[in-house]
Amino acid sequence: ELSVKTTGKAMVPILNALGYDLYLPGNWEVIYYKKAMQTLLGSLNAPKVCANMYHDLGDGKKGELIFPPYYIWNIKGVKIGFLGYTDPLVPLRQSPEYSRGIIYKGPEENLAYYVDVLRNQEQCAYVLIVSHLGLSQQLHLANREECKGVDYILGGDTHERVRKPIQCKYSKVVEPGAFGSFVGKLSLTIQNGKVISDNYELVELDADKLKADDEISALIKENEIPFEADINSIVGYSTIPLYRYFVVENPIDTMVLNALKWKVPEVDIVLSNGFRFCPPRATPDHTGNIPITDGYLYDMLPVDSTLRTGTVTGAQIKEWLEKELNNVFAK
């Protein structure tokens, strides 16, 4: 709710306080449209990378990259290269209006070129892809010859808990779960200017064991004050735990669809965006049921979209479902 009502601005000081070293725009960075994305990401202190988002010059003509394609860490004379790739299917999987003015291309279009730049021109000892493609697309990419020379794909988008790196033909692939529940930790052993070994682990962030940072907690509280009453306002109750952990069907999405069906009972099919993130809510209050706050509605549906109805054919529905299943599970 805080992000929606401030069009993302409230998140900037919080992210800067967290002290990230590098950013990659994901599929939802375009939610407030291109100009706002550039302004918001430009307000973040750390560098940004993305090698497959271009300015749209009109008539399908591709301009320059919006962000630098790569970033290099120099650690005691050893260069570690980071290449960025986001999901090229954004205009197809979300409303194309969000990403108007941006042209996306597949990573395979320039990956081999930039790997060559990092390995041979920049003399990087280790090359990683920071990715927001989703696990199946990342595995597909790691088996393509263009990925030769990439050591790891540090993946995102589908929020999978990959506890052991998946070794593909050319690269290893990992993903670190969702909503801050885990952190992926990659440790490199460097000797005589070369990386001689690596070790990856998925570190669980247990709120019962880790104390919240006082400074960041205060900053979040300060940003929430104007909207606190709305965020904490109870709008309903659930008799079952609400979560969104599974790949295909979840209690949260089922509840959302049931609500849509209740609102427009005359339609045959109801659809909702398959968000893959949302903190669970399972603790009953004094009523014995689980309270649903206004703020939690925005956790479940973090896009202030309009409910729309329309007419489609069975063939259109089948084609759309086949494309989605293929994009998510096959490619």
PLM regions: where:
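Acidic, metal/ion-coordinating pockets
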Residues: E1-A207, V247, P251-A259, V270
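Solvent-exposed loop/linker segments at secondary-structure transitions
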Residues: E1, R119, Y152, S187-K331
